[in-house]
Amino acid sequence: MAGARRLELGEALALGSGWRHACHALLYAPDPGMLFGRIPLRYAILMQMRFDGRLGFPGGFVDTQDRSLEDGLNRELREELGEAAAAFRVERTDYRSSHVGSGPRVVAHFYAKRLTLEELLAVEAGATRAKDHGLEVLGLVRVPLYTLRDGVGGLPTFLENSFIGSAREQLLEALQDLGLLQSGSISGLKIPAHH
């Protein structure tokens, strides 16, 4: 990831008190739906439009009162997504990666949690009633996992948006590693260079 150095979780947790930890989660669910009756959706993946106009994943900074990274992440998910986020819990087994950037002393931890489609739909339905809606979070968006016939519409165009930090790279890595796209789809994408 551009400008970021990957750390093992143990190394990240041993950095000491001068470091802040931020945790974010990619929430996804299998989706049997079809766009226009012919384009398979495959999975629903949630991202959010942030207060700064950039796309990112739900989550935030872990506070000192949180007993673990996951406790802090689950608290943040309830604040940003609403009470439907209390129906599931992101666990250590959902952990994907940790990165530090060249800027402030912040470690970014990334998780991916598979939900049922019903759980994901409940999160979407309740998100506008969440504590942080309209403040830190301006709304949820789904990631289009298809490419239209023009070769540009869908995921390639979505990737042209402005993303916070490493969110774009985390998304692409998760799509590939979790098998959320059809085999070979990422290598065949006309992915514009990161702005």
UniProtKB/Swiss-Prot annotation:
Q: Name one GO biological process term.
A: mRNA catabolic process
Q: Where is the Nudix hydrolase domain?
A: 18-173
Nudix box: where is this motif? 61-82
Q: Which reactions appear under catalytic activity for this entry?
A: a 5'-end (N(7)-methyl 5'-triphosphoguanosine)-ribonucleoside in mRNA + H2O = N(7)-methyl-GDP + a 5'-end phospho-ribonucleoside in mRNA + 2 H(+); IDP + H2O = IMP + phosphate + H(+); dIDP + H2O = dIMP + phosphate + H(+); a 5'-end NAD(+)-phospho-ribonucleoside in mRNA + H2O = a 5'-end phospho-adenosine-phospho-ribonucleoside in mRNA + beta-nicotinamide D-ribonucleotide + 2 H(+)
Q: According to its UniProt record, where is this protein located?
A: Nucleus; Nucleus, Nucleoplasm; Nucleus, Nucleolus; Cytoplasm
Q: Which residues form a coiled coil?
A: none
- Binding site residues for Mn(2+) 2: E76
UniProt: substrate binding residues: H24, R50, F57, Q170
> What GO MF annotations does this protein's record show?
5'-(N(7)-methylguanosine 5'-triphospho)-[mRNA] hydrolase activity; chloride ion binding; cobalt ion binding; dIDP phosphatase activity; dITP diphosphatase activity; identical protein binding; IDP phosphatase activity; magnesium ion binding
What regulates the activity here?
Answer: The phosphatase activity is inhibited by the product IMP.
Which residues take part in binding Mn(2+) 4? H99, E173
Binding positions for Mn(2+) 1?
A: G59, E80
Free-text remark on how the cofactor is bound: Binds 3 or 4 divalent metal cations. Acts specifically on U8 snoRNA with magnesium as cofactor. Has broad substrate specificity with bound manganese or cobalt (in vitro).
InterPro entries associated with the record: NUDIX_hydrolase-like_dom_sf, NUDIX_hydrolase_dom, NudT16
Q: Which of UniProt's keywords are assigned here?
A: Cytoplasm, Hydrolase, Magnesium, Manganese, Metal-binding, Nucleotide metabolism, Nucleotide-binding, Nucleus, RNA-binding
- Entries under Gene3D superfamilies matching the protein: Nucleoside Triphosphate Pyrophosphohydrolase
Tissue spec: Expressed strongly in lung, kidney, adrenal gland, testis, heart and brain.
Q: Which cofactor does it need?
A: Mg(2+); Mn(2+); Co(2+)
PROSITE patterns according to UniProt: NUDIX (PS51462)
What is recorded on activity versus pH?
A: Gradually increased from pH 6.5 to 8.5 in its IDP hydrolyzing activity.
Q: Which GO terms describe its cellular component?
A: cytoplasm; nucleolus; nucleoplasm; nucleus
Task: Summarize subunit and interaction data from the UniProt record for this chain.
Answer: Homodimer.
Q: Which family does it belong to?
A: Belongs to the Nudix hydrolase family. NUDT16 subfamily.
Protein name as catalogued = U8 snoRNA-decapping enzyme
The organism that produces this protein has a lineage beginning with:
Eukaryota, Metazoa, Chordata, Craniata, Vertebrata
Q: Which gene encodes it?
A: NUDT16
